């Protein structure tokens, strides 16, 4: 963590459970042999690709501030927290991550995100994307919602009675009913 590493070979450390290699200069990271890994922080590198498909025990993934244009987490069913902000993501499929409670995907190029199956979600930060719609009606445990800087024209929050933080400035909203969020 916080070095100037441009290479990191961990392929032989098969029992590795946690890896913090954030704030380096890594352009690639091979974690395919690290099938025991539960916590991976590779924030603030130069990664253009990250394959976590074999890391099925992964619970915490932080890959903010890289150059990722795609992130496939279809096999990561144990994921509880995902932070993938400040990348170049255009799509993000989180429908298989049913345990997800925190999602930070801000400052990407997302024009849609489906959180309808992520009913455990309590924190969602999707600000500064290109979202046209955001349906959080199934996310009744949602407490923190940051969706500022998108292109939302409608935001229904009447089922999100647990909401304690909301930031939705810089959208196309004409009205916002918060009467159920008292």
Positions of PLM-derived features:
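Low-complexity/repetitive intrinsically disordered segments
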Residues: 1-6, 174-182
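Canonical leucine-rich repeat
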Residues: 8, 29, 50, 71, ...
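Leucine-rich repeat
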Residues: 2, 13-16, 32-37, 53-58, ...
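Extended charged/polar low-complexity repeat regions
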Residues: 17, 89-92
